Amino acid sequence: MSFASGCTPVSFDKLFEVSSGDKVSRENWGMIARPEPQHDSLKRRNTTSSIAKKKAKMTRGDEQITDETARKAATQLLDQIQDTPGRISLNFETPEAASVCPIPTSLNQIVNTKWTVNQLQEGQLTMLLAQDANKFKSLGVKNIKKGSVETQILPRQMDVKEIVEKLKKQDNDSDQFVGYAAAVANVLRRCDAETAQKITQAITATIEKEAPSIVNC
């Protein structure tokens, strides 16, 4: 039996009809609705692909500000954070409005996250204004200030040279030398047993010589 003799002819109309029975032609191509998928995974795929992602809702409270100038400034800034995150433009018309919104150092890092303004008070936007004005330095624009963030390296993150240099540059009391002990401990962890023993013996001998009263107490 040949391959052709085992096939059943299919008409043009049957070949191009959809499951609902409608015929597809050049005139109605694309107009006939696709059949509703029966399988759950197909339904879920079609649904999720056609729905736009929802933006995180920002809780606002600028209407609670009683001062009109301050409220306009707060509303302007919140609108930008909500509508154009990452492109914040501070164009305040008056120095009074500018003084409402000092800008923290981390503003450029957190504008893309969800913003929540809670306990909004007159002249203060939570996360945008500082409680302590002394923590801000000037940006060069009148009444707009930027937060100053200092990074502190912990003693356990320093090596011995860094600790020694730090101790040379400032007046220190005995408590501040604890960082040196942490640095020495880091050295001992990295040494082999023989070297660590020599360092420990040298330090112990110095302690016994310089602070015998403490060793013996």
UniProtKB/Swiss-Prot annotation:
Tissues with expression: Expressed in main body hypodermal cells, the hypodermal seam cells, pharynx, intestine and some neurons.
Biological process (GO), any one: positive regulation of protein localization to nucleus
Basic residues composition bias: residue spans: 44-58
Domain of life: Eukaryota
Keyword hit for Nucleus: yes
Gene Ontology CC: nucleus
Keyword match Nucleus: yes
Region of interest called Disordered, as start-end residue ranges on this chain: 33-65
Location of this chain's protein in the cell: Nucleus
UniProt entry keywords in alphabetical sequence: Nucleus
Entry function: Required for the A-I editing activity of the double-stranded RNA-specific adenosine deaminase adr-2 by facilitating adr-2 nuclear localization.
Subunit structure: Interacts with double-stranded RNA-specific adenosine deaminase adr-2.
Protein name: Adr-2-binding protein 1
Gene from which this protein is expressed: adbp-1
